[in-house]
C-alpha cells in the first residue's frame, strides 16, 4: 500500500508515469465498446405540427319532433359542431321550450345563436364564428347569389 501511495505522489509531481490497476479494466472495457447495445434509446424526435391543417367541419341539421331530442342537440354543440335546428313543424309551446333549453345551453357553452328564418336557428359553439346577419344576407342576395 505504501508503494502505491509513493507511486501516486511521484506521478502527481511528474517524476513517474502512474499505472493504476483500473487501467487493465479500462483496456478490457475498450474492447467491449463495439459490442455494447444501449438499454433504452432516448432519441428525441421533433414533433412537427402543421398549423394549416384543414379539418372538415360538419354542420348537423335537426328537425326535432319531441323534447327528448334536445340533449342530443346539445351533445353536438359540446362536441364543437354547429347545429341548424328547424322548429317550424312543432307546436309553439314545444318550440318555445326547445328554444329556451338550447339558448341556455348556448349561453353555458359560450356559443352563439342566430335566427335564419321563422323557426330556423343556427347554433354555433365558441369555436365557430357567425359573422353578419344571415337573415339580411338572404334577403339581399337570395339563397343562390349567382341567380340574381
Curated annotation (Swiss-Prot):
Species whose genome carries this gene: Alkaliphilus metalliredigens (strain QYMF)
Protein name (Swiss-Prot/TrEMBL): Cell division protein SepF
One family name in Pfam for this protein: SepF
InterPro entries xref list: Cell_div_SepF, Cell_div_SepF/SepF-rel, SepF-like_sf
Keywords: Cell cycle, Cell division, Cytoplasm, Septation
Biological processes annotated in GO: division septum assembly; FtsZ-dependent cytokinesis
Compartments (UniProt record): Cytoplasm
An annotated GO cellular component: cytoplasm
Subunit structure: Homodimer. Interacts with FtsZ.
Xref: PANTHER family: CELL DIVISION PROTEIN SEPF
Lineage of the species this protein comes from: Bacteria, Bacillati, Bacillota, Clostridia, Peptostreptococcales
Functional summary from the UniProt entry: Cell division protein that is part of the divisome complex and is recruited early to the Z-ring. Probably stimulates Z-ring formation, perhaps through the cross-linking of FtsZ protofilaments. Its function overlaps with FtsA.
